[in-house]
Amino acid sequence: MSITAERKTALIKEYAKGNKDTGSPEVQIAILTERITNLTAHFKTHGKDNHSRRGLLKLVSQRRSLLDYLKRKEEARYRTLIERLGIRR
């Protein structure tokens, strides 16, 4: 259900603006998207896991807030990010 440290590092390298960038909205949204994808796959086999479903809804809400922030600040970055991640919006 969780992502490995190696995968997280790869996501940070892929979406970061600089060497030490781990907190930009793009990086945070990419990590949240990976976690959401993993949880969605988990629910295909564990449909009654309501405790984890609540966590999924929290992650989706957090990602939505970050996406709204990015859209408000710089729409061009927002558009390229949702295109790269394959998020429908």
From Swiss-Prot:
Organism listed in the record: Methylorubrum populi (strain ATCC BAA-705 / NCIMB 13946 / BJ001) (Methylobacterium populi)
Similarity comment: Belongs to the universal ribosomal protein uS15 family.
Keywords: Ribonucleoprotein, Ribosomal protein, RNA-binding, rRNA-binding
Subunit structure: Part of the 30S ribosomal subunit. Forms a bridge to the 50S subunit in the 70S ribosome, contacting the 23S rRNA.
UniProt-listed InterPro entries: Ribosomal_uS15, Ribosomal_uS15_bac-type, uS15_NS1_RNA-bd_sf
GO biological process, one term: translation
Matching SUPFAM superfamilies: S15/NS1 RNA-binding domain
Name assigned to this protein: Small ribosomal subunit protein uS15
GO cellular component: cytosolic small ribosomal subunit
Function: One of the primary rRNA binding proteins, it binds directly to 16S rRNA where it helps nucleate assembly of the platform of the 30S subunit by binding and bridging several RNA helices of the 16S rRNA. Forms an intersubunit bridge (bridge B4) with the 23S rRNA of the 50S subunit in the ribosome.
Molecular function terms, GO-annotated: rRNA binding; structural constituent of ribosome
HAMAP family: Ribosomal_uS15_B
UniProt superkingdom: Bacteria
